[in-house]
């Protein structure tokens, strides 16, 4: 069995949309976790949140950005720099990990809140030729997604894979920590 390696990665946080931008801030001793006075029903807690100003600056980098939710745009932006340098074939897997996807859309539309629809919108943006593989198992989903992608490649189901792990600060997610 051939070894499987991670050969490209990216990270999108309040520090920026690259590993280097995040590393530079960490080396300086900076933290993206800060006190949030109020968010939904919660008051005075600490979390990492991508502010609206940063989001609006990033949003302009995505074509037809008005048809995507905030979380879908985060997923597209995080993947864009590594997919732009690659080819997606019918043997390329797309594994997406999220706790609840677009759960904040539930009050507007069941369809928008569907994790399946959420994953398909991101997959369609990049023209993946396979159905997205969805892993939804709370905080450990990202590690499971990497493991599953690795196993699919080892089993010769796919030649390569893109793994996207993402969640957003929402009332639902915060309630789980309360």
Regions found by a protein language model. Give the residues of each.
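Conserved "HGTGT" condensation-loop signature of ketosynthase/thiolase-family condensing enzymes
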Residues: 1-132, 137, 151-154
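Active-site-proximal beta-strand/loop segments in catalytic clefts of secreted hydrolases
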Residues: 9, 165-166
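Glycine-/small-residue-rich "gating" segment that lines the acyl/pantetheine channel
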Residues: 15, 147, 169-178
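Solvent-exposed, non-transmembrane amphipathic alpha-helical segments
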Residues: 42-46, 142, 178
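Short, well-ordered, mixed-charge alpha-helical segments that flank or form enzyme active sites
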Residues: 102-106, 141-144, 168-173
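Active-site-proximal alpha-helical scaffold in enzymes
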Residues: 133-165
């Amino acid at each position: 069995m051939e070894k499987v390696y991670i050969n490209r990665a990216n990270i999108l946080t309040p520090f920026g949309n690259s590993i280097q931008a995040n590393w530079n801030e960490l080396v300086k001793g900076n933290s993206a976790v800060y006190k949030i006075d109020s968010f939904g029903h919660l008051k005075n807690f600490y979390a990492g949140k991508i502010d609206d100003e940063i989001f609006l600056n990033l949003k302009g980098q995505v074509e037809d950005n008005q048809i995507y939710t905030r979380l879908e745009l985060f997923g597209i932006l995080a993947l864009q720099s590594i997919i732009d340098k690659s080819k997606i074939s019918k043997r390329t897997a797309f594994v997406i990990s999220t706790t609840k996807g677009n759960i904040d859309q539930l009050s507007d539309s069941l369809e928008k809140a569907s994790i399946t629809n959420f994953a398909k919108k991101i997959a369609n943006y990049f023209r993946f030729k396979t159905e997205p593989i969805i892993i939804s198992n709370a905080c450990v989903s990202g590690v499971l997604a990497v493991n599953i992608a690795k196993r699919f490649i080892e089993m010769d189901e796919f030649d390569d894979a893109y793994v996207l792990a993402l969640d957003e600060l929402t009332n639902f997610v915060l309630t789980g920590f309360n």
